[in-house]
């Protein structure tokens, strides 16, 4: 994915950016800019390196003070939406930290064309009071700005600087999430769910308490809670299970839990058959299977896969067949040897079988 994004910062993009910046400022040294950007190292530069390299060269070849540079960028930003537009907030991140108020206004503007979620983070680390600005943004009419108020303060945002102060104490974030948990835009409330999921990894009880407070509020908030608690649900946390009505699993009998093959080659797939029956009163069940993958060092690592969540009537019986694939992925390398697969009902492992990869 990084390779694909890297290629968005193409020679054509650099040429278009050069023309547009020159159109908006006669001070811009377009010839030196394009020569220095597309240097001998350009082809080998990775994603973030290309982005930082471009913003550095804008700064070097636009001989104005910072605020006047931003005025020029403000005229160009609307032409470069999407990922390539991140060079504009990146410019603010690299060169605007000593002019907070002006820079924050620029980030608020630029996020409406790409995203300022990465660029805002050094400002939050530098000055924790900026969380109050993000709270104000949570009331903004523009949904991109509202999303930034949540996404920008996620403690563990992927590809981004970790915000240690919120990993340690996420309470300053909560007023923003309280305000946005029922937002009309899914782009916004998805960010709330992801922020809470980040928090749950270090403060599970805090997120569970919020869950009790928010449950039943609306369909949107129910969706937010389910996704906010996804890590705890996969871990089988009983309080998270109970919040969604998944309690005792004793009445669900496992009639069959089997793999079509117990010996497979790496790259092959097989089928998993699950036959179950509810022998008790009607109840909700969350069904998952977990594979214990053999690691290179000889230990095992569990990965949980959801099958379904549904209510079973008394005496209801079901047979489920799932495809289980063992081809290597960019995120998972398989190793020959003993593996395990187990069935989880309402977060509790119920049955485990062994199989071998070769």
Please tell me what each predicted stretch does.
Residues 1-240, 265, 271-273, 283:
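Surface-facing alpha-helical segments and adjacent helix-coil boundary elements at the starts of domains
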Residues 239-254:
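Proline/serine/threonine-rich low-complexity linkers at boundaries of modular beta-sandwich domains
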Residues 252-255, 296-309:
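Short beta-strand and strand-turn-strand segments in soluble, beta-rich domains
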Residues 258-265:
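Short beta-strand segments of immunoglobulin-like
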Residues 328-338:
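Short glycine/proline/serine/threonine-rich loop/turn segments at secondary-structure transition edges
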Residues 328-330, 344-353:
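Short acidic/polar inter-strand loop motif in beta-rich domains
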